[in-house]
């Protein structure tokens, strides 16, 4: 039980005592010179887990996705991705601004492009048309509510792209959630794609960092882009040390977060005025809708007054993310707050119209 129940994101997780200890005692060197032994251990472990030749430690998931785009496209090309993908929505148009590539967003049912959608979107050679440079996938899918796709589904999309000589990048910020939920190995999801990014600082609770993995040659290019973006860090083993603890100690417990998300989703489904598709609650994200005018905004502020923090992601939609700093009692407290607020609305004909 925590004083504040913070369901805004799994990025809010605090480092564990074991991480703090590992950070304090980490063996370090200059990583731009490729002489930091702790970073090298982390990158080697990431490569092994993803089944790729090499790994690269980067500052964030955003930087991991960007260096992957930059290393696999050239200006004037187009990347195919889902309309609700993180790269398209939340990465500050970096692919366009820094990479000079055009994004081609495609609407999907659960966040995953089908092989047919990819096949139809790949551009033919024509002087008028930007050549397709990359296909980007996301698993688990953030804006679709932590939805999963299987290694086989990724393989089917990658086969279509491969036939057109187009590489595939996987934004696997939460790929360990997918792996734990489906009881599959991360390397199975990564096998069909040329590059994969995963994050240490979300459900795995490290304070900083993501890994990009792919072929040795790809990582060489990504390392140059990282340097150009100002991401060449020096004695960064102090951060990598926490990342090693994240990978060694924090993966299996993600199942608890999934169970808590399910409990939260099932509780929400019983409330008046709340709409939720429980079939989408597959990992640690719960998205639900309050369709009354002003309802979502009012729910956020009334929850905050009860020390329950949730995040509005659209006019009527709210996202809750479970993580290691939210336990089962906290979930029940959040549900208690939702119940009090929505029952009160029910008795008084809805939330105040101005949303306050
Ligand atoms: N997502 C954050 C916000 O940016 C929305 C969150 O709170 O969920 N890919 C995916 C699928 C992500 O969800 C995120 C972060 C990233 C990439 C970027 O990672 P960071 O925040 O490390 O740059």
What are these regions (language model features)?
Residues 1-278, 282-290, 296-306, 311-326, ...:
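Conserved PLP-enzyme active-site core in the AAT-like
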